Amino acid sequence: MKKILTLSIILLAVSCAQKPVQQPLDNSVVYEMNVRQYTPEGTFAAAEKQLPRLKDLGVDIVWLMPIYPIGVEGRKGSLGSYYAIKDYCDINPEFGTLADFDSFLAEAHRLGLRVVIDWVANHTSPDAKWVTDAPLYWYERDAEGNLTFTADWSDTANLNYNNPDMCTEMVKSMRFWMERGIDGFRCDMACEVPLEFWERAISELRADYPGMYMLAEGEEPLLHSQCDFDASYSWELHHMMNAIARGEKNIPELLEYLAKDAERQPADAYRLMFTSNHDENSWAGTEFERMGDAAKVMAVLTFTLPGGQPLIYTGQEMGWNHRFAFFEKDPIPAWENNDYTDFYKWLIKTRHDNPALASGDKGGKFEVVSADDSTLVFTRTLPDNKVTVKAELKAPWSYEIVAE
């Protein structure tokens, strides 16, 4: 019996030693993966082989752009938009199979990475499974009974959130993926969906999955205080940084924005900060097109400003200066490490090593040391950790981070 007990303890110790440690959410760095463009193959199987590289880079949360089958009716380009979804509970065959996704997910978890998937709740494709299988009133319709769409999204059909059956099925579809083992969702155009739906969905899912991470594309404070999202987009900050890089905004305006955002957002809100993402890259240009030589110092701000949770988009970690085609195959031909890889590794390690840089109210107090026409110096301070950041926000753009 003593030998059996000893063996059990040894096996338990080995199991615990092998269990990957995930970074706390408040100190995590998000990586947005564009599966179609991530490898020449554009598949989960090929992307899975690259996960150790992401682990080495240091990121913590892998956000997958929509992984579902894409509608054919009204399709844009030859492959279509990821955001025109035909079936919420299946995989785009372009990327592989559900088994391939499960393998990708298992490998990510083995490496200690969280995986969240893009959730497009506002609309489906006009030939979606629900259009053909569900009652007519699951969708918004015009006076003639035709499906409706927003803006120029003619490859989509707006859902009807006044219908409780549709809402119930939407939560059920989200649960399908949580049961499969994902760690949460990035919710597209979150404010285009009634906040009451998010409040219900998050409450019901968190009852069974308390660690679920929720990221909203939107800036409405109620996304946090009412709906209980963890993180929300800092779109206004992003556009402010673009404008500073062009010489159209200045340091006082940046500080005014930060004070306003801190006042209106809940203290524990994570504010997603970025110099690029899939929308900006494809439609507004790369960070180098928009920010020029200021791109690196702006990235430093996304890792160090108060409340922030930093995001890295596909290719940024090697300085990939290319607008990805949105509706076609346009992959990175090969991955290589360079000075941008070293830069982002340094930024991520600096964040992980300094609790004062954590998101929400877990991070250190923000204080401006000095600010003039070109230079901003600020500190983030906890009782046992202090980080000083110096950012030159005019040419020659530069940065310095000192931790103590």
PLM region spans:
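Carbohydrate-interacting/catalytic domains
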Residues: 16-63, 69, 102, 107, ...
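Sec-dependent N-terminal signal peptides
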Residues: 4-13
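Short catalytic/ligand-binding loop motif for oxyanion handling, primarily in non-cytosolic enzymes
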Residues: 70-75, 123-128, 193-196, 222-225, ...
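Active-site-proximal helices and loops of the catalytic beta/alpha 8
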Residues: 105, 172, 188-274, 292, ...
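Substrate-binding/active-site clefts of carbohydrate-active enzymes
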Residues: 19-45, 51-60, 66-180, 200-209, ...
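A structural motif
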Residues: 59, 182-183, 229, 307
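A cross-domain feature marking catalytic cores of carbohydrate-active enzymes
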Residues: 35, 66, 117-123, 189-191, ...
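Hydrophobic faces of well-ordered beta-strands that scaffold small-molecule active sites
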Residues: 29-33, 62-64, 115-117, 185, ...
